[in-house]
Curated annotation (Swiss-Prot):
Main function: Component the THO subcomplex of the TREX complex, which operates in coupling transcription elongation to mRNA export. The THO complex is recruited to transcribed genes and moves along the gene with the elongating polymerase during transcription. THO is important for stabilizing nascent RNA in the RNA polymerase II elongation complex by preventing formation of DNA:RNA hybrids behind the elongating polymerase.
Biased composition (Polar residues): 331-344, 377-392
Extent of Acidic residues compositional bias: 258-271, 290-330, 345-367
A single Gene Ontology CC term: nucleoplasmic THO complex
Protein's name in the database: THO complex subunit MFT1
Region: Disordered, residue numbers: 258-392
Length: 392
């Protein structure tokens, strides 16, 4: 059968407020044994069985008396202890109530003390916040550059009037409130700098900077002297160059008319060189082809030898005529160059440069004719005939 909600609440209340009394339970236990033994004697159900605890013997009766007496004493001491505890609790409660009655007169004083304590705690909290702000500012000052704003009166008090005026003129102290009257003590000036270094460190830095500036000044003066000396030398060189350019401009104006003829002759020389190169390339190509043909037609060489000799004689005559014409052209160009050499030294060099390729071309032409003759009758005849046809 399930318990109701009321029964459950009663059980919980008993468990919460109940207290296990061990001496009382032990005393009830021994009383239960004595009651059971006397009930058995009265009802006549007492047994002489040794296995039962309720056996009526002198020893059991003496043990029951002793146990009952001891447990009674234990229970009595427990009751006395609880009685003393209750009395102490009542005394304490009475004293507490008496004190509460006496505190009613002192309650306003306690409330005023409480309010004062709260006020002091608030002041301590504000002081703590101010210390934190100062610590943050000190950390900022130690880390790098920061700004500091103070009135002019305080600046003059710390630094002096003359130094403050000097710093204001150098724009080191900058005015924060431009609307105030000028040169008044209420003006606020701001400074932005690194305050993490001490006076001794700043003095050493200032001394090292002064020594560096002096060294730089000496180096600049020495370099300035060198630059002035070099400038004089460069000025003289420039004047010499200008004079030389004026002289050359006059010579170029005189030789301007001769340059036109020289350009025309140089064009003719270039055309002659190109023509000779084409002839030489044709001769080389024909020479290679004829060498291949000679290897294929060695067995026919004996039958055609007489006819080729006659043609070779005719070709040699034509080649000699061409060489004579080239030599005549070279002599005429050499005479013209000699005449120009008397007029101007520079034009002489240019014509000399042009004459040299002609001589080289003549030498190369002679070498090619000589090599073509060494290759054999067929090759030389064919190359000579092709060169003659090209010249014509």
């Amino acid at each position: 059968m399930p318990l109701s909600q009321k029964q459950i609440d009663q059980v919980r209340t008993k468990v919460h407020y109940s207290e296990v009394d061990t001496p009382f339970n032990k005393y009830l236990d021994i009383l239960g044994k004595v009651t059971k033994l006397t009930g058995s004697i009265i009802n006549g159900t007492l047994s002489n069985d040794d296995s039962k605890i309720e056996k009526l013997t002198e020893q059991n009766i003496s043990q029951l008396k002793e146990s009952a007496h001891l447990r009674f004493l234990d229970l009595q001491s427990s009751i006395d202890t609880k009685k003393v505890a209750d009395e102490n609790w009542e005394t304490c409660q009475q004293e507490t109530l008496a004190k509460l009655e006496n505190l009613k007169d002192k309650l306003p004083d306690i409330k005023s003390i409480h309010s004062k304590l709260l006020l002091r705690i608030g002041k301590l909290q504000g002081l703590y916040d101010s210390v934190q702000v100062i610590n943050r500012e000190v950390e900022g000052l130690s880390e790098g550059r920061t700004s500091l704003v103070v009135t002019r009166a305080e600046w003059e008090k710390e630094l002096g009037t003359d130094l403050v005026k000097f710093l204001i003129e150098k724009n080191y102290l900058k005015l924060v409130d431009p609307g105030l009257k000028k040169d008044s003590s209420e003006e606020r000036y701001r400074i932005y700098d690194d305050f993490s270094k001490g006076p001794k460190e700043l003095e050493s830095i200032n001394a090292s900077m002064k020594s560096d500036i002096e060294n730089v000044r000496q180096e600049v003066s020495s370099y300035k002297e060198k630059w002035l000396r070099d400038a004089e030398i460069f000025g003289k060189i420039t004047s010499i160059f200008k004079e030389e350019l004026l002289k050359r401009d006059g010579l170029l104006n005189e030789a301007e008319g001769d340059n036109i003829d020289e350009d025309y002759e140089s064009d003719e020389d270039e055309e002659r060189k190109e023509r000779f190169k084409r002839q030489r390339s044709m001769v080389e190509v024909n020479t290679i082809e004829n060498v291949d043909e000679k290897e294929e037609s060695d067995h026919e060489y004996d039958d055609q030898e007489d006819e080729e000799n006659e043609e070779e004689d005719d070709m040699e005559v034509d080649v000699e005529d061409i060489k004579e014409d080239n030599e005549v052209d070279g002599e005429s160009s050499q005479q013209e160059d000699n005449s120009r050499q008397g007029n101007n030294e520079e034009t002489d060099k240019e014509t000399g440069v042009i004459e040299e390729p002609d001589a080289v071309n003549d030498a190369e032409e002679a070498d090619s004719d000589h090599s073509s003759r060494k290759l054999g009758g067929t090759t030389s005849d064919f190359s000579a005939s092709s060169s003659v046809e090209e010249v014509k």
